[in-house]
């Protein structure tokens, strides 16, 4: 009986931890990070900006049969709860529950630079670069769970500053300001995957020439947008 209870508890904890996970990293056409996408239960997705703000969330009807390239989300009809006026001033009005997933935020008594920022999505915790750190990435996400997020610093090439450099063990490299104007600043490689663009002298200038717009690295999708 004890063994049975242990198995049930273990399965419940496993489901709690893995029901929230980062599902996609979207990169804009200019090389800037567009969103980090997180998958919850019931085909719900949360889109976060690089400074940890929730840009949108909702039901992703495309999950299971095709990629949601445009990021179109439908209203979620399950449990939705918000922090009330009785909660800490930095939390009031923010989304608290989406289904059974709890979202928490840094409170008003915590570090001034963190107040109101997203602290956790379920079991996934977030930390941020603080005000004393490099100007190119202060205020941006520093960790997502156990993954370290590194951004190009202000002393690096002008077309790289503030762009995503490392997501955990995955490295992102960009064309710098000395490259052809048609693709300077664009993503050049993600891990072992390379991207080549049409030059300013070619017909489809700046469009992707070789490389896939959607790749999968260690279970996380990286999507290169054309805009």
Feature-to-residue mapping (PLM):
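Conserved positions within tandem-repeat grammars
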Residues: 89, 93-96, 101-104, 112, ...
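Sec-dependent N-terminal signal peptides
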Residues: 4-14
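Surface-exposed acidic loop/strand-edge motifs in secreted or periplasmic proteins
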Residues: 50-101, 106-110, 124
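Eukaryotic tandem repeat interaction scaffolds
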Residues: 131, 153-154
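Long terminal segments
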Residues: 2-3, 20-73, 148, 154-227
């Amino acid at each position: 009986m004890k063994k049975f209870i242990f198995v049930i508890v273990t399965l419940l904890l496993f489901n709690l931890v893995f029901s929230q996970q980062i599902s996609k990293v979207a990169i804009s056409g200019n090389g800037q990070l567009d969103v980090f996408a997180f998958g919850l239960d019931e085909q719900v997705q949360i889109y976060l900006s690089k400074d940890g703000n929730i840009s949108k969330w909702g039901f992703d009807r495309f999950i299971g049969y095709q990629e949601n390239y445009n990021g179109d989300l439908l209203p979620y009809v399950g449990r939705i709860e918000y922090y009330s006026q009785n909660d800490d001033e930095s939390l009031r009005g923010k989304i608290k529950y989406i289904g059974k997933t709890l979202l928490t935020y840094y409170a008003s008594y915590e570090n001034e630079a963190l107040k109101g920022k997203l602290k956790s999505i379920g079991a996934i915790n977030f930390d941020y670069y603080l005000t004393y750190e490099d100007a190119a990435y202060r205020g941006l996400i520093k960790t997502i769970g156990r993954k370290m997020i590194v951004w190009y610093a202000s002393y690096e090439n002008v077309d790289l500053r503030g762009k995503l450099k490392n997501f955990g063990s995955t490295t992102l490299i960009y064309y710098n300001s000395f490259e052809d104007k048609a693709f300077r600043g664009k993503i050049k490689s993600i891990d072992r995957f390379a991207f080549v663009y049409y030059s300013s002298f070619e017909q489809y200038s700046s469009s992707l020439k070789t490389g896939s717009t959607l790749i999968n690295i260690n279970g996380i999708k990286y999507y290169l947008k054309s805009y």
